[in-house]
Swiss-Prot record:
Belongs to the metallo-dependent hydrolases superfamily. Adenine deaminase family. The lineage of its organism: Bacteria, Pseudomonadati, Pseudomonadota, Alphaproteobacteria, Rhodobacterales. It comes from the Bacteria. This is Adenine deaminase. Gene3D superfamilies: Metal-dependent hydrolases, Urease, subunit C, domain 1. HAMAP family: Adenine_deamin. Its cofactor is Mn(2+). One of its GO terms (biological process) is adenine catabolic process. It is an enzyme of class 3 (hydrolase). Pfam families: Adenine_deam_C, Amidohydro_1. It catalyses: adenine + H2O + H(+) = hypoxanthine + NH4(+). GO terms for molecular function: adenine deaminase activity. Its EC number is 3.5.4.2. SUPFAM superfamilies: Composite domain of metallo-dependent hydrolases (SSF51338), Metallo-dependent hydrolases (SSF51556).
Amino acid sequence: MSRSLSECIDQGRGLVPADLVLKHGRVFDLVTGELVQTDVAICGDRIVGTFGTYTGRREIDCRGRILVPGFIDTHLHVESSLVTPFEFDRCVTPRGITTAICDPHEIANVCGLEGIRYFLEASAHLVMDLRVQLSSCVPSTHMETAGAALEAKDLAPLMDHPRVIGLAEFMNFPGVLMKDPGCMAKLEAFRGRHIDGHAPLLRGKDLNGYIAAGIRTEHEATTAEEALEKLRKGMRVLIREGSVSKDLHALVSILTERHAPYLCLCTDDRNPLDIAEHGHIDHMIRTAIRLGAPPLAVYRAASLSAADAFGLKDRGLIAPGRRADIAVLDSLEGCHAALVLAGGVVADDAAFSARSDIEPVARASVKVAEIAPEAFRCPGNRADTPVIGILPGKIITEHLTAEIEPVDGDKRPDPVRDLARIAVIERHGKTGGRATGFVRGFGMARGAIASTVCHDHHNLAVVGIDYADMALAANRLRALEGGFAVAAGGEILAELALPVGGLMSLRPFEEVRDALVTLREAARSLGVTLEEPFLQLAFLALPVIPHLKITDRGMVDVDRFEILP
C-alpha cells in the first residue's frame, strides 16, 4: 500500500484528498504529552498530515476518541499463544498491537531453520508487522535434547533478511561469561547489530561482562532493584507480563516519565485464553495506569520507546512520515480499541480474510515409543531428594529437598505433602532418554497432566500422582501429534491437539481458548491450584531459569549449571 513520495507530499500539504482521514479525534502526542484535537491524514501506509483539517477519499469519524501510536510487543514467542502466526495476528492486532518482535525458538528447537523460515514467510502475509529475531540458543544449553541445533553459520544466511531484527534472547548467560566458543561465534557474527538479552538475577560485574558482549535489551528483571541496575548499566528493560511470568506489579514503580525512554513492554508467553479474558499489551497499559503509572510514561513504553530500542525509527508517533500504526481508543485509562490501523490498513475481518495462508511445518513431530506406567518410577536408595518448588506467577523455582523413602526401589508421589512426580521424555526421535523427579506446588491429588510444550527443547513433560494416568496422558499426545492432556481414573478428561511442532493448533483461536477453559477445569478437578498449570509445567524444564529444573537428561541445578547426580 505504499505511495510515491510525490503523492505523500501533496496529500500532506492538503493539495489533494488523502487516501484516508481520521476526523475529529484527539491525538495523544508522546513528545509533549498533550491531547490535541486534529485530523490525521494517511497516504498509503504512512501518516502525512496532523495538526490540521483534511479531506479524504475515505473518512472515519473519531469524535470522542483518543488516537495513540500502535503498540509494540518487544519480546514474545508466538508459539506460546498456541496458534499459528495467522491466528495470533487476528487475535491481538484488533487490540492495538501493530508490531510484534518474536523469537521463534520454540519451533526452531523442534525443526531448526525450517521453523524460523516459516515465521519469516508468514510475516509477509499478516496485517500486523511481525519482526523476527534469530534464535540464539537452540538448544538453550547442553543439558537437554532438542530437535535441532543452530550455530552461527546456520543463522548467517538470514541475518540480512528485511524482517530480521538481530539476535534473539541470549539465554545461555553462563556460556557468554565463560566465553563458550559457540556463544562467542554468534556474538561476533552479530556484533554491532541488535542482540537481545536474558539474564535473570545476574548482577554486579557478571552483568557488566554480559552487557559488554553487546547485549542491549533484557526482559527477565523481576524486582525494581534488578531492573534499575540494568537501566543504570545502559540496558533497555522490557517489562514483562505473560501468562506465568507476571512482573508488571513488581516493576511498575520504575515506570515513570523519567525512565520511560528506556523501558518497553512485552508479553513473552501469553496464551489465547488470557488474551481473550484480559488482553495483551493493552492489558499491561490498563494495569500499569490503574497501579499509578503516568499515562504518558506507559504509552511511551508501549510504542515510542519500544520503536527506538529496536531501531524501528519509522513508527512510535502519530506524526508525518511515520508508519500509519494507530489505535483509536475509548480513553487512555480504559485502552479499549474501537479501531486499529496497521500500516494504514484497518484491522477488521475483511483485512484478515484477504490474507494468503501458507502451509504449516513440523507435522508428526512426536517421535516416541509407547510409554508404559513403569517409565515413571523414580529409583533411588537415599531418602534425601531434590524437589522443584513452584513459585506462583514466576518461572524462577526453588531448589527444595524432601525426605522420601524408597518403596520397592521407587520413590513414590505423595499428594498429602504436595509431592507430585514430574517426568520429561525425549520426543524428537534422537535418544529416547527420560528423567523423573519431584515437584511441589501443583496441589495435585490424583491423575496426571501432560504437555509437549516444554521449554525450550519441547520434549514430552508429565506431572502426576498415578503412573497409569501419566502413561495414558503421555500416549494420548503421541496420537494427537502433541498438545495438552489431562487424565484421571483411566480416562482422558480433556485434551488439545497442537500438531504444528507439538506447539501450535491449526484451529481458530476462539476454539483454542475454549479448549483451554476445559483443560483448566479438568486440571482443577485433580486438585491443581495453579492458575496456568500447563505453561507453569512448560517452564519447569527450562535449565536457564534458576534454581532447579528438569530435562530429559535429569534434574538440573541451574545455579551450578550442572545435572544432579
